[in-house]
From Swiss-Prot:
Organism: Pelagibacter ubique (strain HTCC1062)
Name of the protein: Phenylalanine--tRNA ligase beta subunit
PANTHER family linked to this entry: PHENYLALANINE--TRNA LIGASE BETA SUBUNIT, PHENYLALANYL-TRNA SYNTHETASE BETA CHAIN AND LEUCINE-RICH REPEAT-CONTAINING PROTEIN 47
Quaternary structure, from the entry: Tetramer of two alpha and two beta subunits.
EC number(s) reported in the record: 6.1.1.20
GO molecular function: ATP binding; magnesium ion binding; phenylalanine-tRNA ligase activity; tRNA binding
Keyword Iron found: no
Pfam families: B3_4, B5, FDX-ACB, tRNA_bind, tRNA_synthFbeta
Length: 802
């Protein structure tokens, strides 16, 4: 945003000089990027007339021009512009002048053998517009008698270039900047009252906003001014327009541009006599075209906001007008538009069509929706003052009402955030100067937010405004505490890191995948919960939050199988999502293994990974984490995505409080659906949220190995019991007879058949007895044998096989 100090003082009564104003702007967050001096730099650019234009003797695209620069003087200039011709009025820069755009200093030079004294300038080179296809063409009726005069007014002024952040659209007008400076104590904001208009008649041009889906225009104000004389702008207006790098065109156009930069209120002017019947604000239809004021034809997409009449599109709402109803010097009747357009719609349409205008820049950031009347008042007054004419009543069409937002602000929050305090009365004064409407109610401030501040919506925004105006230098510099506090982790975090190491130590590779997954695969691993769909997924195959990590791991395992790898072990610890409510997100350690078990010795036989291997991995990890193996309870229930006969679940005790793990073969039906060709695929899930604090600290996992100097003994037992009896209970019963002596209980045979009653089975177990204090005698061993038999028969109903 560019401003001049003189223009700023139209709104701000201040005693500060320019340098002090620049410093204050930066202090309040309106960073000054640079100051361009216009005093003297443009004095040498004069109005000139081409007397003769001949083809260059050695270059087809160059012309040698004789140029009249006033006072009977003419100079030779070599020019490459295609529009350089005899009789053209343009702008000449002599040797020594500095071109505004490139900052290049001109010198006398030879171009293909012909000496050129200076340069004929395009509008782009003079920063008047983006037009660079040819040299500037000046109107003969306006400039014919001014040959030799300076084109730019001789004013001693500097242009201050301010960097406006995207949230501060209100400062894209001079008044918004003045308001901030006044609030910061740089002066007093001048109350500008418009002259009361003598509105003769009603506005006779019908305007209608189509209330349709995605309508970007919520309000459209218009004012008809009849009998105007669209003339050249007065010097004061031209000075302001030129200072900001704009080209004066005509009084009506210059007035609309001036109000946009002055009040941040974009306007548009229509030649009423070129409008076909009525104006309709509607959504465009795909394929509609119109010629814009930049002389380009645009082809529109669906649902772009357009201003139209019976003959078609007149302009793209809030972005650019069309040539068909543009005002000319002979315009007699003009309709002024002051409307509000949705920032999102403006941003979308301008991006598709690749259009960038000053109006678009403001609308896409959000202008004041309640400034429609203000814009019409200022425009009607200036047009009537400069161009004459009769002003109609204002016509305001709306499809919804805009109300100011409000919030409650607790002043104590300011000190909590900033570290320093200001008096509540000073807070009220600052906010009042910024345009807030404040009422104090029992120490709380009820604040109505200014309509031009869409960026303010919560208390912290108010804190930011207060500290910005009061000054960031008020915040005291406090050295950070150098005492480093001991970092503490909760149980789940400790388990997370411990299980990472524990599972990896068993030959698993850790994978890190998205928390998103493909709904088609996720459905295979859902039990009773519902999927959580992602509204705007980063990919079509990552469209839901995963219910199980299996849905990610199984895909990556299959990719590795496809690359020729067979024996694979992956795990991941991360979140799963069973619902959208609090507590329905779980942290789960999940693993998959496929192929054959790695042999520990060449003497061992190769075999496929099975359910017992993955069960062992889970139990070992839990034991290493500090949970008592003897307290773990296992049964054969598991979710439907496990093989029903080769799976199970683990509880921390027999009371079955919460499942801490599932394990087993992955269901063959899932492998078939996913076309996974593998001989064996087993998996596990450990639920960290269901694990209670272990009695043994996670720090105390490495315990001293207790070895014995005494010989161990082995005893084999065979028990006959019910066919459906779970072996785990039998093993636990034997282990609990004497935990110090009994080191191992393993099943080595299961028999059904001759000599075994129907409905029964024989289970043979090997028991290792390891004394720590003395060698056991035969009597000692017989006592232990009898204790084992008695315990099994009394607790399980089994009988020793004879």
């Amino acid at each position: 945003m560019k401003i001049t100090t003189a223009w700023l003082k139209d709104h701000l009564d201040t005693k500060l000089n320019e340098n002090q104003i620049i410093d204050k702007l930066t202090d309040i967050g309106l960073e000054v990027e640079g100051v361009d001096s216009q005093s003297g730099e443009l004095d040498q650019f004069v109005i000139a007339k081409i007397l003769k234009a001949e083809k260059h003797p050695d270059a087809d695209r160059l012309r040698v021009c004789d140029v009249d620069i006033g006072s009977g003087k003419s100079v030779k200039v070599v020019c490459g512009a295609p529009n350089a011709k005899e009789g053209l009025l343009t702008i000449y820069a002599p040797p020594g002048a500095v071109v505004p755009k490139s900052q290049m200093k001109l010198v006398v030079s030879k171009i293909r053998g012909v000496t050129s004294y200076g340069m004929l300038c395009s509008e782009s080179e003079l920063n008047l517009s983006n037009e660079s296809d040819g040299i500037t063409e000046l109107l003969p009726e306006k400039y014919n008698k001014k040959v030799g005069e300076n084109y730019f007014p001789k004013k001693n002024l500097n242009v201050i270039d301010i960097s406006i952040t995207p949230n501060r659209a209100d400062c894209l007008g001079v008044r918004g900047i003045a308001r901030d400076l006044a609030a910061a104590g740089a002066g007093r904001l001048i109350n500008q009252k418009e002259k009361k208009l003598d509105k003769k008649n009603k506005q006779t041009i019908s305007v209608k906003i189509e209330n349709e889906k995605n309508q970007a225009c919520i309000s459209f104000g218009s004012c008809l001014i009849k009998g105007v004389k669209n003339t050249e702008s007065p010097e004061w207006l031209k000075d302001k327009i030129i200072a900001l790098g704009q080209k004066p065109i005509s009084a009506i156009v210059d007035i609309t541009n001036y109000i946009m930069f002055d009040l941040n209120r974009p306007l548009h002017a229509y030649d009423v006599d070129k409008i076909d019947k009525a104006i309709v604000v509607r959504n465009s239809k795909k394929g509609e075209t119109f010629e814009a004021l930049d002389n380009k034809e645009y082809k529109l997409e669906d649902e772009m906001c357009v201003i139209s009449d019976a003959s078609g599109v007149l302009g793209l709402g809030g972005i650019i007008g069309g040539t068909r109803t543009g005002t000319e010097l002979d315009t007699k009747n003009v309709l002024i538009e002051s409307a509000y357009f949705s920032p999102r719609s403006i941003r979308k349409s301008s991006k598709i069509l690749n259009i960038d205008t000053d109006a678009k820049f403001r609308f896409e950031r959000g202008i004041d929706p309640l400034s429609i009347d203000q814009g019409l008042e200022r425009a009607a007054n200036l047009i009537q003052e400069i161009c004459g004419g009769e002003v109609s009543e204002f016509d305001i069409q709306k499809i919804e009402d805009v109300k100011k937002k409000s919030l409650k602000f607790d002043p104590s929050l300011f000190e909590k955030i900033t570290g320093f305090n200001i008096d509540i009365k000073e807070m009220i004064k600052i906010l009042d100067n910024l345009g807030f409407e404040i009422k104090e109610n029992k120490g709380i401030l009820d604040a109505v937010i200014p309509s031009w501040r869409p960026d303010i919506s919560q208390e912290v925004d108010v804190v930011e405004e207060l500290v910005r105006i009061k000054g960031y230098d008020q915040i005291k510099i406090i050295e950070p505490e150098k005492v480093r506090k001991k970092q503490t982790l909760n149980l789940k975090q400790k388990l997370f890191h411990f299980l990472q190491r524990s599972i990896a130590s068993k030959g698993y590779f850790e994978a890190i995948t998205w928390s998103f997954t493909d709904s088609k695969i996720n459905q295979l691993f859902i039990e009773n919960n519902k999927e959580i769909k992602i509204i705007n997924p980063i990919s079509s195959d990552l469209n839901v939050l995963r219910s199980s990590i299996f849905s990610n791991l199984i895909i990556h395992l299959n990719k590795n199988l496809g690359r020729g790898f067979k024996d694979l072990s992956f795990f991941e610890i991360g979140p799963t999502f069973l619902g959208s409510e609090p507590g329905e997100q779980q942290t789960v350690a999940t693993g998959l293994r496929s192929g054959k078990l790695a042999r520990q010795s060449w003497l061992e036989k190769e075999r496929l990974i099975d359910v017992f291997d993955v069960k062992s991995d889970v139990i070992k990890s839990l034991v290493e984490a500090g949970y008592n193996k003897d307290k773990l309870y296992i049964d054969d229930e598991a979710p439907s995505y496990y093989h029903p006969g080769k799976s199970g679940r683990i509880f921390l005790n027999k009371g079955k409080e919460k499942v801490v793990a599932f394990f087993g073969d992955i269901h063959p039906g899932i492998l078939k659906k996913l076309d996974i060709k593998v001989e064996s695929l087993v998996g596990f899930e450990i639920f960290l949220d269901n694990l209670k604090q272990p009695k043994k600290s996670l720090k105390d996992q490495k315990t001293q190995y207790k070895y014995s100097d005494f010989q161990k003994s082995e005893r084999d037992f065979a028990f006959v019991l019910d066919k459906n009896f779970k072996v785990q209970e039998l093993i636990e019963t034997i282990s609990n007879v004497d935990k110090e002596l009994i080191k191992s209980v393993k099943v080595f045979d299961v028999y059904e058949g001759a000599n075994i009653p129907e409905g029964k089975k024989s289970i043979a177990l090997n028991v290792i007895i390891q004394p720590l204090e003395k060698t056991l005698t035969e009597d000692d061993l017989n006592k232990i044998n009898q204790l084992i038999i008695s315990a099994v028969e009394s607790k399980t109903g089994a009988k020793i096989r004879s």
